[in-house]
Amino acid sequence: MSNNENIFIRAMKKGDIDSVNAIIEACVMGWDLPERVKRLSLGSYRYTEHDLDHLTAVVAVMTGNGIVGIATWNFTAAEDLPKNQHGMQLHGLYVAPRHQRRGVGSRLINCALEAAREQGMEGLTVKAQSDATGYFQSRGFTNLPVENEERDYPHRLWLAV
């Protein structure tokens, strides 16, 4: 485990984009998908300066290591939430592979949860990569049912604040 005192969370800056995208690439390339699929989809996971106009983005910085993780979120559509709930969607959560299992992801999720609370939301939803659902479930997220197979992403999860 890392010492959480050596990790601080701050707003992502435009100058962080290259470091963040390197972390995203390392994470995506480790997913349980065919190599061709990872290469073809990687571009859709990378962030640009324009994304910072539409998402809240924070980075986890570890003393002596620089940026080791990122989380982004925004408000989400009602059809992606449990009925009669208001929430935010965790758009992205990535931790550099060599810093995983050290509490960085939990710190980033807690930051998003706090933002949801501050905005008067009831929870946080995420559309997870299939092999990441266990991680989110271990953090208290629960699966949302697929009500419309043509529209609903199959790995949607919810965590009430």
Name each region found by the language model.
Residues 125-127, 142-159:
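Conserved catalytic-core motifs of GNAT/GCN5-like acyltransferases
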Residues 8-22:
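A short beta-loop-alpha structural element at the N-terminal edge
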Residues 116-129:
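Conserved GNAT acetyl-CoA-binding A-motif
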Residues 66-75, 89, 94:
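Conserved beta-strand in the GNAT
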Residues 95, 101-114, 138:
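Conserved acetyl-CoA-binding loop-helix of GNAT-fold acetyltransferases
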Residues 21, 25-47:
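Conserved GNAT-fold acetyl-CoA-binding loop/helix
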Residues 48-59, 89:
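A short helix-loop-beta-strand connector motif used in the catalytic cores of GNAT acetyltransferases and
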Residues 76-91, 100, 150-153:
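A conserved beta-turn-beta hairpin within the catalytic core of GNAT-like acetyltransferases
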